[in-house]
Amino acid sequence: MEPWDPPQLPPVRHSHAAGSGRAEGRHGTPPPWRPIISGPLPRPGSWDPGRDLHRPASQAESYESGHAFRAYSRQGYEDPHWQYPGAAYRDNHAYQSHQWQPTAWQGNRDVTQVKPHGKSTTYRDQHYYRGYHPNLAASPLGQDRSQTYDAYKEGSRRSWAGVSNLGEASGQPQQPSLLQQYRESGLSSSGYELSQYIRDGAEPNDTAFLGGWSPVQGGGPLESAVMAPHKFLQPHVPVCLGAGGQLVLVCPHRPTEGQLPLVELHSLEVILQGTTDQEELQAFPGPLAREDLHKVDVMTFCQQKIASSCDLSTQRGRDSALLWKLLVLLCRQNGSMVGSDVAELLMQDCRQQERYKRQEPAVGPVSLADEEWRQLGTLDLITGEVPPVVETQAQIVEKFTKLLYYGRKKDALVWAMRNQLWGHALFLSSKMDPRTYSWVLSGFTSTLATNDPLQTFFQLMSGRIPQAAQSCGDAKWGDWRPHLAVLLSNKVGDMELNHRAIVTMGDTLAGKGAVEAAHFCYLMADIPFGYFGVKADRMALLGSSHRQAFTQFATKEAIQRMEIFEYCQQLRHPTSFLLPFQVYKLLYASRLADHGLPAQALLYCEQIATVLLQQDPTSHPVLAQQLTKLAERLKLCDPLLLLEMPEQDPVLEPQWLLQLRTYCQHCQVQDDLAPEVALTQPEPWDTTATPGREMVHEQPHSDGPHDEQWHQPPVPLQGPDPHQDVSIPPLEVAVLGVGPISQEELCTEPSLQAVPTAGDAEEPQDAHGVQQPVLAELQELSTRARSASESSTASLEEDSQTSSDSPAEELEGTSEDKSFGFRWFGWFRSKPQKETSPKATTSGSPTPGLQDRRSPSPPGAVPSAQPPASPSPYRNPVSIDMKGPWDADGHEPLPGMVPLFNPAQVSQLAAARPTQPRLLSQRRYPNPL
């Protein structure tokens, strides 16, 4: 019956030979059916537990015979290949082109129509399964297949049901299965379910169905399982680069055939010999900060770069050559230079003196009478015009004098300007009003070309930034160097004006792509070097724009040029260095190591370490760590170290590397212990704290004239002894590797504050059931340090009055701290300007501004203070259930007091507020866990 056929009624029973199969029921007389077995129809020639004559059915088999099993889904493969009959069965049993229905299809049939096929030894000898199953394909005919049937049943049951073997199929002595061990040991049903997905290694029939598919994979590899292809089908050559400039190569071999690997070591310096990059690295005499280097070698290298890499036919090449010439000048003069020296260098590099076209003088509104002063000449017969008479210099001066005879100064001034008598005009106008002098001066400068350096000079002398500084770099303006030479050689009284003019010229050139020219101007203006990626910085590497990609920015030529400039500064000041440049030195050292020059790279590492060890321990921790990693790989390339290394001490290292490693470890420990420094470091108030109480975290306060102590230990519940001195020595917070920190330094870092809401974790209690009061907000105690002769009672009373007289200010300060505590702008928040009560602004109290920002002292610290007559109305809005040490005595808390909370709750608040900076909260309130 096909799955698409409609269900049919049970046919009439007729006698028919057993084993005729389903094909005869379809193409011939319907076979008789015997409703004796419920479940799936057994396959012809297969083993059936209901007809096994060798042994009785077990409990598991009885269970299987009464329940229809459903096959595993194979996602598109409906018929497992081992369910189809072999070719021999089709030939002997008239199967023709019809195939055996899968078990899942047989389950759809009526259980009353199931009839087992008769099975005999002769039928078994025919064996339709021959040629398919691996255990039956090679077996001779006529052999008893009972053991094979048992193995088939056992493997089929594991494949369909997914359970372990019960140990009865093979009939051979074996170890109990995993499922049986679980049942005997009394494990729960979860162990039974787990055993369904675990193959028992003690089952002997695991090889019965190696070619069959099963969702439960065995522990060992299957023959027909899909194997991952090899990454390399043929023997290959593994290659790696060593830190000492070595190339490690493993020759191809076959380890399975017993071939030993052959390792070859090649020098990268030899392999890369003749390449452009290596020749460029070897030509540079770096590192320059060494004793055996002479500055002549550096000057020679600069001149070689000018001749080889600078194209003087282009403006960019001339600008690059100018930078190299400036470095030569600095080396020759030991790092010192003046404006006139640079001006001479600028004019030497110019190809020729440009000729600037002069303009005709512009006459103002004052003019002369043409008919009175014009001298007419002979009429030209060709053109019909009367040409003017060309007057000599003497005649021009004579007419200027005649005008002054008649007192016509304005006319004389205009005559002098028309005839280029600028000396006479300027002197005459200087003795007149200032407006006339400015008019003559502007008329004189208007006769000069716009791009004339004289125009730049006169504009600078006039007290304004020259126009050339804002417009240079264009084709119509010509070369920018004469203008810079004028600015450098002629310093005006206002040095700020001269500096701004040079910087403006550099910015103009940089905006038009002339990076080398702009950096030349920046060097003349003493602009400091910045960092890559910071657009506000004007330069990071000399002659290279830091606004382009890093690979194009950090070139070898730019790093070498920058190192020469640093060397020139060291010639003048031996201890000077460029701190932002050290990271590029490390990059250059790594490139040297990559090109097979490890000894030279190690010298760079030593110089960088020397600079870092002179700095603050927290200046550049990342650079120090990367430098340590590279130096540890290159340390054995030092020839001096190899000569001094004894045979019994193979771990000898240079001293600078040991110091650098210690410095890196110190920085790492500081970073790891920063959130927990308050818990790990002993604090001065530990000896005065009450046992069973948590310590108060550090609290900065204002540095007033009398505020020498900003921490007060908890006071016992019975009150302080009136004869006891409660003054505390000045507090010094110990920080790892730094030493004691003053109170002024602590005040520079504001605290982070937060008030928990109702429902948060309560404070821990001691053995007496009293909760531990811990300060978690910034508060400034109004108590001051008193001498042994002063009484502590007066101080406590004053504190009580101060805290009780200003409850509104305290509550406002608390809410203000809560709103700004975990925000970044809270670090820069200015002090609120408020008017305080006279008691809060006395000489013995802290600063009023800071007192408004902080909460008062804890109520448990002043039990002897008298509360005010009326309770404060600001107690009710507080949304937290606070309990303090006063609960043990049954006393009510003092009115107007702001309750405190446990700092252990800060971690919970930070977790509930993901937008808050967790790092700051952990730093100020370490996690006690």
Curated annotation (Swiss-Prot):
Quote the subcellular location field of this record.
Endoplasmic reticulum membrane; Golgi apparatus membrane
Q: What is its main location?
A: endoplasmic reticulum
Q: Does the keyword Transport apply?
A: yes
Q: Name one GO cellular component term.
A: endoplasmic reticulum membrane
Write out the biased-composition intervals (Pro residues).
1-10, 856-871
Bias category Low complexity: which stretches? 781-795
Q: Where is this region: Disordered?
A: 1-64, 675-727, 781-929
Q: Which GO terms describe its biological process?
A: endoplasmic reticulum to Golgi vesicle-mediated transport; Golgi organization; peroxisome organization; protein localization to endoplasmic reticulum exit site; protein transport
Q: Is Protein transport set as a keyword in this record?
A: yes
Gene3D superfamilies per the record?
A: 1.25.40.1030
Q: Where along the chain is composition biased (Polar residues)?
A: 838-848
Cited InterPro entries:
Sec16_CCD, Sec16_Sec23-bd
Q: How does it assemble?
A: SEC16A and SEC16B are each present in multiple copies in a heteromeric complex.
Q: Which family does it belong to?
A: Belongs to the SEC16 family.
Which protein are we looking at?
Answer: Protein transport protein Sec16B
